[in-house]
């Protein structure tokens, strides 16, 4: 009696468990569907944007798309044509205005330049003064050349005495048939010439009196004994003659020892 009751109870328990599971499953599904139904998308979310684009792609037919593309191309063409016309018009107007402005500027520059050049001219450097040559006097007497006899007598008198007194000059000019001014000027020129000659002789003597050292070479290196290079060459010195050149020999105004 106990054996048949056991399996019957187990089967009833299994059925009750399966019913409870089935009853729970639809509740869960309904809960999920309700949650999904309650879920809303924002208008700017990625899902909403993707959903709109997909709907538009599905709704638009190829014929409508072709028409829209053609209409868009026509609009673009007309836009660019109008824009090109406007750009050409604006360029022409701009070029005209630039030409007018350039003409006005050139006129203004010319006027300002003329005004500035007329009123503010650059300072001119003073030209160098021309070299003024000494001109002879118009009333100057012609130069009278001296004769040879007059020149000889003048040279002889100058060697005797370089400066003449008034009486001597008057007497000497009468003897040569010359004026006192001619004799006076000749003596002045002759003294200047004698001074120039004396200075030139002094310069020549100074140049000649400078010692001229001839280059020489040492027979052996410095610091080395002379015995290595042989005995030095000895030359006999001349013996001075007694009685000769005891006193200084004078040549003019200088003495040689």
Curated annotation (Swiss-Prot):
Keyword Hydrolase on entry: no
Record-level Gene Ontology MF annotations: DNA-binding transcription factor activity, RNA polymerase II-specific; RNA polymerase II transcription regulatory region sequence-specific DNA binding
GO biological process: dorsal/ventral pattern formation; embryonic morphogenesis; embryonic viscerocranium morphogenesis; fin regeneration; otic placode formation; regulation of neuron apoptotic process; regulation of transcription by RNA polymerase II
Alphabetical keyword list: Developmental protein, DNA-binding, Homeobox, Nucleus
Coiled-coil region(s): none
Biased composition annotated in UniProt, kind: Basic residues: 133-143
UniProt main location, coarse: nucleus
Positions of the DNA-binding region: 139-198
Biased composition (Low complexity): 111-121
Transmembrane segments: none
Alphabetized InterPro entries for the sequence: HD, HD_metazoa, Homeobox_CS, Homeodomain-like_sf, Msh_Homeobox_Regulators
Annotated compartments: Nucleus
Region Disordered: start-end pairs: 1-37, 91-146
One annotated Gene Ontology cellular component of this protein: nucleus
Keyword Nucleus appears in the UniProt entry: yes
Highest taxon of source: Eukaryota
Start-end of Basic and acidic residues biased regions: 12-35
PANTHER family: HOMEOBOX PROTEIN MSX (PTHR24338), HOMEOBOX PROTEIN MSX-3 (PTHR24338:SF9)
Function of the protein: Probable morphogenetic role.
Name listed for the protein in its UniProt record: Homeobox protein MSH-B
Annotated organism of origin: Danio rerio
């Amino acid at each position: 009696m106990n054996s048949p009751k056991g399996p019957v109870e187990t089967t009833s328990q299994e059925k009750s468990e399966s019913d409870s599971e089935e009853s729970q499953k639809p509740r869960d599904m309904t809960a999920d569907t309700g949650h999904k139904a309650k879920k809303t998308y924002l208008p700017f979310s990625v899902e909403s944007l993707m959903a709109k684009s997909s709907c538009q792609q599905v709704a638009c037919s190829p014929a409508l798309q072709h028409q829209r593309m053609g209409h868009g191309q026509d609009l673009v063409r007309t836009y660019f044509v109008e824009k090109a016309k406007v750009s050409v018009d604006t360029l022409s107007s701009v070029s005209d205005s630039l030409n007018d402005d350039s003409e006005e500027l050139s006129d203004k520059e010319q006027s300002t330049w003329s005004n500035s050049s007329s009123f503010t001219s650059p300072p001119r450097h003073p030209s160098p003064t021309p070299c003024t040559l000494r001109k002879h006097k118009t009333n100057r007497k012609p130069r009278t050349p001296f004769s040879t006899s007059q020149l000889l007598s003048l040279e002889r008198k100058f060697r005797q005495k370089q400066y003449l007194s008034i009486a001597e000059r008057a007497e000497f000019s009468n003897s040569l048939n010359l004026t006192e001014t001619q004799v006076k000027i000749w003596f002045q020129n002759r003294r200047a010439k004698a001074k120039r000659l004396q200075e030139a002789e002094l310069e020549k003597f100074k140049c000649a009196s400078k010692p001229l050292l001839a280059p020489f070479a040492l027979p052996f290196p410095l610091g080395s004994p002379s015995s290595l290079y042989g005995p030095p060459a000895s030359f006999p010195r001349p013996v001075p003659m007694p009685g000769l050149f005891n006193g200084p020999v004078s040549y003019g105004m200088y003495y040689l020892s």
